[in-house]
């Protein structure tokens, strides 16, 4: 079992506060996770008082998923006394490596993380005192480059998000089983469904007013979920996801975790070549630091060609998904299943829809 980033940030913050109140850093701290309603004890790597007014403590992330990119990343918490007359009791800030919301400028420290920090720090903060807490992720900016955070408005680092303290391993068979169970229940009610790739997919489905009863959340196991949809006799299936994730399917990659396969740059370059872009532009796409940067470059340089490229990618996703189902299901299972896709961009607006995707979207809106 592992924990989410907010839990480790809270452990470091509590340890730093106890440095100030007790004069020494504890080797471990016990936290109330809130969700679930239980306490857990976590180790503290290092900690010390910097002076009488401030302290620093460090933990290391230990999520349950061995492929989680935050595994073993250090989390620092810098805690200092504040004037209790003018300052809030507990002030929480994001330091280096903690992302910020591009739209608001606020640190990407969300509700559960703030509640977890506040609840546990109040247990150790003297009644007459106030503290400021800054969470620092020294590797946060580098790690964020390997995520799609920037595409969804979170820049300069990682988010402290989640709704629970327990990390759900992305590769756990039991989690895939839960997705399959949800798929089975919804397939029994409707033959036209939407695979929403991650939380962003669910949000876009809501924007499109797709009924929740038609939406099935998926993570990285698109291959097994496609096969399951065929076995549950789904007739129409829309893949709704961020283009930087679904593009992998165009190359036949059906487990999309970045640690297992991250050929997005190569795939995009190949489709640019098929669209007839010259060698210099292909080099620019190939050498872009991220796929998002490459797409921005194309948007700027060849805005008239980019829709064609994305349309070809969407069409190829349909082809490869259909071929995957046929390869993994004995006939006649899945032969009548129509797969389409809709890709959205960083602004959560649809940027490309395959022909089958358009048909399925119309079907859903009619019903």
Curated annotation (Swiss-Prot):
One of its GO terms (molecular function) is cobalt-precorrin-5B C1-methyltransferase activity. It comes from Thermosynechococcus vestitus (strain NIES-2133 / IAM M-273 / BP-1). This is Cobalt-precorrin-5B C(1)-methyltransferase. Belongs to the CbiD family. Pathway: Cofactor biosynthesis; adenosylcobalamin biosynthesis; cob(II)yrinate a,c-diamide from sirohydrochlorin (anaerobic route): step 6/10. The lineage of its organism: Bacteria, Bacillati, Cyanobacteriota, Cyanophyceae, Acaryochloridales. GO terms for biological process: anaerobic cobalamin biosynthetic process; methylation. InterPro entries: CbiD (IPR002748), CbiD_sf (IPR036074). It is an enzyme of class 2 (transferase). Its EC number is 2.1.1.195. Keywords: Cobalamin biosynthesis, Methyltransferase, S-adenosyl-L-methionine, Transferase. HAMAP family: CbiD. It catalyses: Co-precorrin-5B + S-adenosyl-L-methionine = Co-precorrin-6A + S-adenosyl-L-homocysteine. PANTHER family: COBALT-PRECORRIN-5B C(1)-METHYLTRANSFERASE. The keyword Calcium does not apply.
């Amino acid at each position: 079992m592992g924990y989410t980033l907010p839990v480790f940030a809270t452990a470091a913050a509590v340890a730093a506060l106890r440095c100030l109140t007790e004069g020494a850093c504890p080797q471990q701290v016990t936290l109330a996770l809130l969700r679930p309603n239980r306490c857990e004890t976590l180790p503290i790597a290092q900690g010390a008082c910097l002076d009488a007014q401030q302290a620093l403590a460090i933990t290391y992330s230990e999520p349950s998923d061995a492929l989680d990119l935050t595994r073993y990343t250090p989390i620092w918490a810098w805690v200092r006394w504040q004037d209790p007359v003018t300052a809030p009791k507990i002030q929480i800030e994001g330091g280096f490596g903690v992302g910020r919301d591009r739209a608001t400028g606020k640190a990407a420290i969300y509700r559960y993380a703030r509640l977890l920090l506040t609840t546990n720090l109040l247990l150790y903060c003297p009644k007459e005192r106030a503290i400021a807490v800054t969470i620092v992720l020294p590797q946060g900016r580098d790690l964020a480059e390997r995520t799609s955070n920037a595409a969804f408005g979170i820049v300069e680092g990682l988010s402290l998000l989640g709704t629970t303290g327990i990390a759900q391993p992305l590769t756990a068979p039991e989690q895939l089983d839960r997705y399959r169970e949800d798929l089975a229940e919804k397939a029994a009610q409707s033959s036209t469904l939407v695979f929403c790739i991650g939380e962003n997919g669910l949000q876009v489905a809501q924007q499109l007013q797709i009924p929740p009863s038609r939406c099935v959340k998926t993570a990285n196991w698109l291959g097994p979920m496609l096969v399951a949809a065929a076995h549950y006799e789904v007739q129409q299936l829309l893949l709704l996801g961020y283009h930087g994730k679904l593009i992998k399917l165009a190359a036949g990659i059906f487990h999309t975790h970045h640690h297992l396969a991250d050929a997005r740059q190569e795939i995009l370059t190949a489709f640019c070549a098929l669209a007839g872009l010259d060698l210099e532009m292909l080099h620019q796409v190939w050498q872009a630091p991220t796929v998002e940067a490459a797409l921005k470059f194309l948007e700027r340089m060849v805005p008239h060609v980019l829709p064609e490229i994305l349309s070809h990618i969407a069409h190829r996703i349909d082809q490869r998904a259909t071929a995957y189902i046929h390869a993994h299901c004995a006939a006649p299972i899945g032969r009548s299943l129509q797969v389409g896709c809709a890709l959205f961009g960083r602004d959560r607006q649809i940027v490309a829809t395959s022909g089958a995707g358009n048909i399925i979207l119309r079907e859903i809106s009619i019903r």
